[in-house]
Amino acid sequence: MEPQIVKFVFKEEMTCQCPKMSDSACDVDTDQNYFEEEVRLASFANFSSSYPVSAPALARAGFYYTGDGDRVKCFSCMAMVEDWQHGDTAIGKHRKISPNCKFINGFNNFRSDCIQTQAPVMQNSHANGFPNSAEDPGEKSSSEIMADYMLRTGRVVDMSKPKYPRHMAMCSEEARLQTFQNWPGYSPLMPKELANAGLFYTGINDQVKCFCCGGKLMNWEPSDRAWTEHKKHFPECYFVLGRDVGNVTRDASVQGSTYMNSYNARLETFSSWPFPIDKETLAKAGFYRIGDEDATKCFSCGGMLNCWAANDDPWEEHAKAYPGCQFLIEEKGQQFINNAQLQRPILHKANSGEASPALPKDTSFLKNPLVIYAQQMGFPLEEIKKVMGQKLKTTGNNYTCVEEFVSDLLCAQSETIADKPMKREISIEEKLRQLEEEKVCKVCMDRRITIVFIPCGHLVACAVCADVLDKCPICCTIIERRQKIFMS
């Protein structure tokens, strides 16, 4: 799946070391053509992915592409930077080379205010929460960053006239479905699934576009799921996040199979169900069986799921794959769906021919304080057992130190992810850039991540930013403790 131009605010911020900039670092002039971030991002259409910096990170930091090598230019202070190196951050480098830039100063001033006040409140009489005048781009950027920061840290932002959805005419799922009249027959995905995921057809090849964030997706593959790809490529889309953006779902009688809206009718389809997952739970979650294998389909949204495992929760899997299902929303509520979307992904179990040393019986094992602590952080029980087993095998002793245990769990998790086959080949430079971006604080986008939040277990912040947060910016869970970690 390859996303097209992303018309949204991006969070990653990685970039440069040997800058070459213009003579003046002062805001003597601005380039109004690149005032909007999405316009700056569009300028990177021919920006090579081999450079050790991502186009979204540069656009977020106020830069647009000049078309010459890796040279970029700030729309506000007009400073130019090129010869990017691994390990740089776009915002950090921008601050260094152009300390008087209004765009960057707006970001700095806002962060200082947040740290001092702990709970900043936006007070702005202008529509959209942004200045009406376009004469001061630095000020507007500051407001935009303020709103973005407050959203990421779980604070409430009151915008009387939000910028979303991008395409008001496509708020109705029925209207989106009508755009697929000429949908190419070679595409493996059905229009109904795409429309339910907030996407409408652009008329170009198999390209679709989100009515809310404006993000584009194309080159669909048989294994793709519309909601999954939408969430993966545009995780900040308000529609994906479950916010009320005016989406109008189709009536259940049109959307799915009305003759399956009865629990008993769905349950009857599982009469000869040989698979390990409970059929009653599947039927309660809205699913009925189709075919001879374990393929199931929701009577309401029409979403299909298969390859069920014994420990799967049908409600959670339903919420992960098809969060827009009206039946799901009515039965479980939006909060349940949001939690499922933010839930830590289950890692594949590693197959090994070697037997691990026997661990204590589950009853005593589960009472181990280290096991309880790791589970509170979100590590899967199978992963915990595997790491403890390896420790016993290599040393003959179990863990006594929390820091060592968590460090080994993180390493094992990284190795498991690294062992997964890649969907597409990417360059060494791209891999290095992605690894660097994963380690950057998702709040300041500058310093390294060094804190894990307890009990949710999310790794998102540096020590400075973690101190001013009361809730996890990913799942909004109240932070009870902050555990310092060391990432290699």
From Swiss-Prot:
The BIR and RING-type domains are dispensable for anti-apoptotic function. Its EC number is 2.3.2.27. It is an enzyme of class 2 (transferase). The gene is xiap. Belongs to the IAP family. PROSITE patterns: BIR_REPEAT_1, BIR_REPEAT_2, ZF_RING_2. This is E3 ubiquitin-protein ligase XIAP. It is found in: Cytoplasm; Nucleus. Multi-functional protein which regulates not only caspases and apoptosis, but also acts as an E3 ubiquitin-protein ligase mediating ubiquitination and subsequent proteasomal degradation of its target proteins. Acts as a direct caspase inhibitor. E3 ubiquitin-protein ligase that acts as an important regulator of innate immunity by mediating 'Lys-63'-linked polyubiquitination of ripk2 downstream of NOD1 and NOD2, thereby transforming ripk2 into a scaffolding protein for downstream effectors, ultimately leading to activation of the NF-kappa-B and MAP kinases signaling. A zinc finger (RING-type) spans 441-476. BIR repeats lie at residues 40-105, 176-241, 266-329. It comes from the Eukaryota. Monomer, and homodimer. One of its GO terms (biological process) is apoptotic process. GO terms for cellular component: cytoplasm; nucleus. GO terms for molecular function: cysteine-type endopeptidase inhibitor activity; cysteine-type endopeptidase inhibitor activity involved in apoptotic process; ubiquitin protein ligase activity; ubiquitin-protein transferase activity; zinc ion binding. Keywords: Apoptosis, Cytoplasm, Developmental protein, Metal-binding, Nucleus, Protease inhibitor, Repeat, Thiol protease inhibitor, Transferase, Ubl conjugation pathway, Wnt signaling pathway, Zinc, Zinc-finger. Coiled coil: none annotated. It comes from Xenopus laevis (African clawed frog). Zn(2+) binds at residues 298, 301, 318, 325.
